[in-house]
């Protein structure tokens, strides 16, 4: 093996002598110079990617908000859906934990009065009361958007998620934020193949139309109107599933065929 002062090469090779105080080296300085260039290039590439990610985060932090809708009546589920546990974790806790991950973005939970207010604050999430859940998901969306803009008038966009979508990956959410920051004026949503679903991030260009929505319809009609502005972040099929009825719960014996994309999310 090649040995230099303080450096051992080929530590995993059979017969290598290892003595106390010796260090493990990755590069034999006597190796061909092209090897050094290759390793250096890789280091620069990794460093460049990290720098790019940090720069993008600095551009996004505080400029986008994260709103989770959780004021639905849960009529089809037949009970308190938000406290229903999956793998021992209630749906609302899963939602709060997801928002906590994105601490650089102001986060809001739209729910019924007195519902999860303390829990939301414990996770650094601002609770927003919906006293009229019977008005549908559009009313919750409007309340969340108005509160986010009241606290942050210069927002570039708002990401809307739903509380009953337990398997959405934070990495997918991060990619939605990244895509929105790189493509201003877009509507960015999660999707699987040709299907679209939640979460959806809306650029501020669409805020006025969002506040004009009525009833139990989400933003699908607006997305249809601006098809050329929609960008889809591909996610796993399971990520897009939501919990509408008890049969949608794991182990209930019914595989959900429909993804949560009729209204781009039914509110929990």
Specify the residue positions occupied by each region the protein language model found:
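Short beta-strand/turn micro-motifs composed of small residues
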Residues: 12, 70, 111-112, 162, ...
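N-terminal glycine-rich phosphate-binding loop and ensuing alpha1 helix
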Residues: 62-114
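Residues at secondary-structure transition points
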Residues: 77-81, 86-90, 111, 131-139, ...
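Conserved alpha/beta core of the MobA/IspD/sugar-nucleotide pyrophosphorylase nucleotidyltransferase superfamily
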Residues: 62, 66, 208, 212-268
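Well-ordered secondary-structure scaffolds
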Residues: 1-61
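Conserved N-terminal catalytic core of the sugar/cofactor nucleotidyltransferase
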Residues: 93-157, 171
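Conserved beta-loop-beta/alpha segment of the NTase-like Rossmann-fold superfamily
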Residues: 134-211
